[in-house]
Amino acid sequence: MKNVYGNALTLTLFGESHGSSIGAVLDGLSPGIPVDEAHIARELTRRRPQGQTATARVEQDPFVIESGVFNGCTTGTPLCIRIPNAGQHSGDYAGMQDCARPGHSDYPAFCKYHGYSDYRGGGHFSGRITAALVAAGAIAEGALRGRGIRIGTHLAACAGVQDRPFRQTDGQIPDGELDALREPGFPVLDRAAGERMQQASLAAKADGGSVGGVTE
C-alpha cells in the first residue's frame, strides 16, 4: 500500500485531487544543494493546463516548502513541499463511486483500497498529482544541474504523428535541442509535427475520443 518510490533518493506522494492539498516528500538529498524556488514556480507554470487540448481545471499552484530547506539550501533532512488545492468541483462526481470510468484509475484504486479511496476527480491518482511530481522534479533537476546533467523530454509520437529524434554530437544532445522544448505548445523538436499532433488531438476531442502518445 506504500506510495514511496526510489532507493538512495526516495519520493513520497501525498494528497488527493479534491483534498485540501497535494505534495511530495524527498528523502536522501545531500545537504547544501541550492533550492531555486523561482525555478520550481516556472516549472509549475509550464505544467499548468494551456490551450484547447488540456484539462479545464486551472490552478495557480502556490507552493510551500514545509521542511528540509534553510537559507536557500537543502539541510539533508526530508524535504516536504505542499501545494494547496483550490479548483475542485466535487459535485461533478456525485454518484460515481459505483461507476468506474474507462481509461481512468477508478477500478484499480477500488481494488487496491477496497472501496475506501477518495474517488472524486481520480483521488490520489488524478492528473492533479503531477503538480507534486513537477515540484519534486524541479528540485532534483537543480541537484543534477550542479553535476552538469540536464533532463529533457519530447513528445516523440502522438496520434500517429512522429516528431524527429534528438540530434546528437559525440553522444551529447546540444543545449539548444533541450531549450527548444521549453517553448509554448507541444514539447516537440519539429514544430510542424507539433501542429499536426494538436490538430489530430482536437479532432479526437471533437469526436468525444482521445489519443495516446510516446515520449523520449
Labelled PLM ranges:
Residues M1-T130, V134-E216:
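Generic N-terminal targeting/processing segments that precede catalytic cores or assembly contacts
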